[in-house]
């Protein structure tokens, strides 16, 4: 048991420079998967004042007009000449090469396949070595930590009001941060502080911004029961946020990996998601680990669980599967590991088949987090393994 403590997580809007880059990378990935589901894509994007640079390694039968995808993505986010990033005039440089044949030979034909294994799901090897984590907790309905859930909700609301024109002076760049107080049983009891910074037109007053953001965003998103007289609210604490987006800060694919996952509440293996096809276990195995963790908690095997998977490049089977329930499990962790091995195929081809990952579903994950989403249908958020896991409680 620990004393009362605080935990903080942040989120950013779809117009944050790093998220622009993530969305462009995933929009390119989706465009390729739409034409060729077997596309191999590792696409990185950099955005800065007046410039988008797209680099990476791609092997595909698809033809994609990269310039058009880039400009369309920027326009959809809502950037204009006035807000500092004009989709029509921004320079777009593309430097894409083919996937390395040395990597391709290990992905196309795994170590197991080279050793005469005939199982078709053993054919694809992991695209890289590394470890990936998945997490779930029962403190929210979407099995996510409360701080990151609230931070994402604030950003979704901010972007929604901007797109609808309900707060007319908002521009696309924004950030939110939420600090939650936990009691000595580790249950969330209140919101201690909220920080929201929104980019805005130059002719609006700070007082109007603070009034609107608190009333129309913060107070509508955060449950009243979690707010009290001691909750601290900070709206645009610098006093001015006119210059934003790539005009103020350069952005890069994969630089918001904690926002993308659990807000720091769980560990992270270090690999980013956006711009990568599902043979890259950085992405697909992280999705599988979340899928496992969410179903384990939903089945009542634990109140919180962190699942670690690890891979060797060119090898299909994971080199390790590890479970940590933080003392909250209803059964032993060995039983949970057994349940995982018996119910989840964790070879790359098995994950791709299990979660149907050759589809163009990725751009929608590139803002507001990849996990705990209720606004879009993501296969790794499904609870279709709960029934199979219930038998392990006996």
UniProtKB/Swiss-Prot annotation:
A GO term from the CC aspect: cytoplasm
Protein residues bound to L-methionine: 57, 99, 249, 280
Protein residues bound to ATP: 16, 173-175, 240-241, 249, 255-256, 272, 276
Principal location: cytoplasm
Pathway: Amino-acid biosynthesis; S-adenosyl-L-methionine biosynthesis; S-adenosyl-L-methionine from L-methionine: step 1/1
Annotated spans, Flexible loop: 99-109
Keyword Cytoplasm: yes
Cofactor dependency: Mg(2+); K(+)
Listed EC numbers: 2.5.1.6
Residue numbers binding K(+): 44
Localization annotation: Cytoplasm
GO MF term set: ATP binding; magnesium ion binding; methionine adenosyltransferase activity
Any GO BP annotation: S-adenosylmethionine biosynthetic process
Residues reported in the UniProt entry to bind Mg(2+): 18
Binding note for cofactor: Binds 2 divalent ions per subunit.
Record keywords: ATP-binding, Cytoplasm, Magnesium, Metal-binding, Nucleotide-binding, One-carbon metabolism, Potassium, Transferase
Catalyzed chemical reaction(s): L-methionine + ATP + H2O = S-adenosyl-L-methionine + phosphate + diphosphate
Its biological purpose: Catalyzes the formation of S-adenosylmethionine (AdoMet) from methionine and ATP. The overall synthetic reaction is composed of two sequential steps, AdoMet formation and the subsequent tripolyphosphate hydrolysis which occurs prior to release of AdoMet from the enzyme.
Oligomeric form and interacting partners: Homotetramer; dimer of dimers.
Family to which this protein belongs: Belongs to the AdoMet synthase family.
PANTHER family listed in its UniProt record: S-ADENOSYLMETHIONINE SYNTHETASE
Name of this chain's protein: S-adenosylmethionine synthase
Species, as recorded: Lacticaseibacillus paracasei (strain ATCC 334 / BCRC 17002 / CCUG 31169 / CIP 107868 / KCTC 3260 / NRRL B-441) (Lactobacillus paracasei)
């Amino acid at each position: 048991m620990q004393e009362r403590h605080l935990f903080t997580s942040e989120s950013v809007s779809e117009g944050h420079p790093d998220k622009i880059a993530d969305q462009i990378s995933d929009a390119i990935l989706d465009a390729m998967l739409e034409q060729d589901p077997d596309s191999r894509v590792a696409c990185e994007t950099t955005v800065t004042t007046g410039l988008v640079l797209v680099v990476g390694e791609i092997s595909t039968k698809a033809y994609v007009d990269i310039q058009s995808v880039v400009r369309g993505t920027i326009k959809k986010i809502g950037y204009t000449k006035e807000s500092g990033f004009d989709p029509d005039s921004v320079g777009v440089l593309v430097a894409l090469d083919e996937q390395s044949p040395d990597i391709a030979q290990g992905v196309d034909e795994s170590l197991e396949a080279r050793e005469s294994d005939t199982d078709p799901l053993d054919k694809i090897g992991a695209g890289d070595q590394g470890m990936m984590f998945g997490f779930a907790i029962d403190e929210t309905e979407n099995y996510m930590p409360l701080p990151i859930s609230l931070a994402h909700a604030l950003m979704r609301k901010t972007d929604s009001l901007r797109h609808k024109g309900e707060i007319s002076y908002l521009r696309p760049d924004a950030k939110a941060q939420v600090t939650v107080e936990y009691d000595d049983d580790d249950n969330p009891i209140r919101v201690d502080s909220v920080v929201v910074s929104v980019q805005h037109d130059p002719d609006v007053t700070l007082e109007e911004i603070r009034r609107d953001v608190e009333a129309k965003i913060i107070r509508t998103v955060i449950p009243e029961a979690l707010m009290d007289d001691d909750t601290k609210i900070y709206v645009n604490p610098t006093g001015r946020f006119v210059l934003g987006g790539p005009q103020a800060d350069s952005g890069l694919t994969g630089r918001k990996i904690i926002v993308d996952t659990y807000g720091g509440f769980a560990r992270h293996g270090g690999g980013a998601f956006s711009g990568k096809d599902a043979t890259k276990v950085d992405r697909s195995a992280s999705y599988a680990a979340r899928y496992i963790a969410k179903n384990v908690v939903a089945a009542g095997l634990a109140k919180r669980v962190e699942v670690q998977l690890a891979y060797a490049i060119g090898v299909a089977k994971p080199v390790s599967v590890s479970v940590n329930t933080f003392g909250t499990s209803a059964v032993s962790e060995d039983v949970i590991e057994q349940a995982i091995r018996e119910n989840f195929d964790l070879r790359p081809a098995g994950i791709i088949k299990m979660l149907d990952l050759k589809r163009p579903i990725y751009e929608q994950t590139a803002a507001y987090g990849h996990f705990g989403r209720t606004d879009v249908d993501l296969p790794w958020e499904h609870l279709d393994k709960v029934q199979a896991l219930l038998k392990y409680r006996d």
